[in-house]
Amino acid sequence: MKLSLSPPPYADAPVVVLISGLGGSGSYWLPQLAVLDQEYQVVCYDQRGTGNNPDTLAEDYSIAQMAAELHQALVAAGIERYAVIGHALGALVGMQLALDYPASVTVLVSVNGWLRINAHTRRCFQVREQLLHSGGAQAWVEAQPLFLYPADWMAARAPRLEAEDALALAHFQGKNNLLRRLNALKRADFSRHADRIRCPVQIICASDDLLVPSACSSELHAALPDSQKMVMRYGGHACNVTAPETFNALLLNGLASLLHHREAAL
């Protein structure tokens, strides 16, 4: 699996791995790259079955497989210890990495994540699946911003959204791969295992997230033994894109604090 690695800003700089959500594209993290590159060696990638890592996914594809293939790619690149920043599905992959490779994951950041899928989130995906089946990739892509962004943010950026739709349609991961990745997301349940995650965790959520209620992050915070939660008042599901200055400040401060906490505990 292909990874994109930034040059380390200094010798032995900590490594940060960015894991996007269901879309799978590493470019989702573009608003964070410039600030993270100054302090960390940053790893981005398109998830298997998407972008520049094309593949046909098995029907039983799982979050555990997503975690294993990423860890193997990191080890092959000479990276054995790393912090993880995951958005939605990416946060699930991050938790799986923390469970399966505890010696490797130094810190986990969960952005609009959850322990197990909420009934409201499931309903949103059911509607989106119906759109995919009835209207194809174009209907899926055109509906997606409604679940990602606040209404006023979208209304002020109509040309940008049109360009994003065209790009997403041109690089659509394929119906079968999308549904198999979505099914992996829906099957994931960390409610009985979260207390085994021992690395420090930063939880960031947006109170106006339409897709994933912020209560999901509260449940995550209660279940994780070493976690702290930050709530953004504005930003929607893709709050790192719509409110990058607020998000980046929370992320950088949290990462630095938790990495220091981790090193002090060793």
Curated annotation (Swiss-Prot):
It comes from the Bacteria. Keywords: Hydrolase. Pfam families: Abhydrolase_1. It comes from Escherichia coli O81 (strain ED1a). InterPro entries: AB_hydrolase_1, AB_hydrolase_fold, AB_hydrolase_sf, Pyrimidine_utilisation_RutD. Its EC number is 3.5.1.-. Belongs to the AB hydrolase superfamily. Hydrolase RutD family. Residues 14-116 form the AB hydrolase-1 domain. Involved in pyrimidine catabolism. May facilitate the hydrolysis of carbamate, a reaction that can also occur spontaneously. It catalyses: carbamate + 2 H(+) = NH4(+) + CO2. Coiled coil: none annotated. The keyword Hydrolase applies. Transmembrane segments: none annotated. This is Putative carbamate hydrolase RutD. Gene3D superfamilies: alpha/beta hydrolase. GO terms for molecular function: hydrolase activity, acting on carbon-nitrogen (but not peptide) bonds, in linear amides. The gene is rutD. It is an enzyme of class 3 (hydrolase). One of its GO terms (biological process) is nitrogen utilization.
